[in-house]
């Protein structure tokens, strides 16, 4: 899923928009996305900053990656030889527009250090 100035018209048939909206309003996912807008972070940094359990955070990060809301910014090898993954939000902001005719969900791409291609 590519995010730039992406819009979703919410209706019962549009499952993608409903899934994205549900996920973003989940307190857990919201904390993860907000935590990684400015800087990429490891799972441990995200957990510590937001007081989140590690196993649940890994599951949410996988789901957010699958939905195209997070990406792997970089992978480094630490002094113990272990791989450390840094995650970053693909979105800078979300706008929900409600009126009598429609419900519109609009994403603004996070321009900070995004990879050239964000269609993971």
Segments (PLM) and residue ranges:
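Short helix-to-turn junction characteristic of helix-turn-helix DNA-binding domains
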Residues: 36-39
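Short, Lys/Arg-enriched N-terminal segment that forms or immediately precedes the first helix
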Residues: 2-22
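A short acidic, leucine-rich amphipathic alpha-helix
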Residues: 45-49, 64
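Short, cationic-aromatic polyanion-contact patches
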Residues: 17-26, 42, 73-98
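Amphipathic alpha-helical dimerization/coiled-coil segments
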Residues: 91-120
